[in-house]
Design a protein with these regions (language model features):
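Extracytoplasmic/periplasmic/luminal assembly and interaction segments
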Residues: 53-102
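Conserved acidic functional residues
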Residues: 80, 108-109
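Short Fe-S-cluster ligation motifs
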Residues: 110-128
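Amphipathic alpha-helical recognition patches that constitute DNA-binding helices
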Residues: 71, 105, 117
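Flexible coil segments in periplasmic/lumen-exposed cytochrome c-class electron-transfer proteins
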Residues: 33-37, 78, 87, 94-100, ...
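Periplasmic c-type cytochrome electron-transfer domains
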Residues: 2-74, 135-150, 167-172
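Conserved beta-strand positions that form and line the central face of beta-propeller blades
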Residues: 68, 105-106, 130-133
Length: 172
């Protein structure tokens, strides 16, 4: 019984200390300061689990069709995705350096994520990251899937290929 009382007292003390720390404004939410590693880890774990759980829609078409990949590249450029994520031969825009967490390197992400997960992220966005919900912005599912097709091909797309697919937009 004493152990339970001690655990309860400790839990209350931790809750009070956490409340003072977070609600007292001691935790900085400034984008100029990086989160501690434990916070990055916790948010990353929650984000990965949430995406995996909610991403249930499967591709309605093959994603390796060249015309779909090229349409996805054009949509990626037209929607300004390169501003935060860059593109083959196109650097990230300067403003993206101020985003926290940093926008991910898509060449790495697309290797780890399934198409259904990429679709879910592009369609629904990610809270507190700057990643918009393009599905709410009126982007159609076929266009979203085309972007996913391009993303899956992204690691092997050369700057010349990308420029040929999108023309002058974005200007490298």
């Amino acid at each position: 019984m004493r152990i339970l009382a001690a655990i309860g007292t400790l839990a209350i003390a931790v809750a009070i200390a956490a409340s003072i720390f977070f609600l007292g404004g001691y935790y900085s939410v400034a984008a100029t300061q990086r989160d501690p590693a434990i916070v990055d880890w916790a948010i990353g774990a929650v984000r990965a689990a949430s995406i995996s759980r909610h991403a249930t829609q499967t591709p309605p078409m093959p994603l390796d069709v060249p015309e779909i990949v090229q349409a996805g590249a054009r949509a990626y450029a037209d929607r300004g995705c390169y501003g935060c994520h860059g593109a083959p031969g196109v650097d990230w825009e300067k403003f993206s350096e101020g985003l926290r967490p940093d926008p991910p390197d898509l060449k790495e992400i697309v290797e780890k994520r399934e198409p259904r997960e990429l679709f879910w992220v592009v369609a629904n966005g990610i809270k507190m990251t700057g990643m918009p919900a393009f599905g709410l912005a009126g982007v159609s599912d076929p266009e979203l899937w085309a972007i996913v097709a391009f993303l899956k091909k992204l690691p092997s797309v050369s700057p010349d290929e990308f420029k040929a697919w999108v023309g002058a937009n974005p200007a490298p």
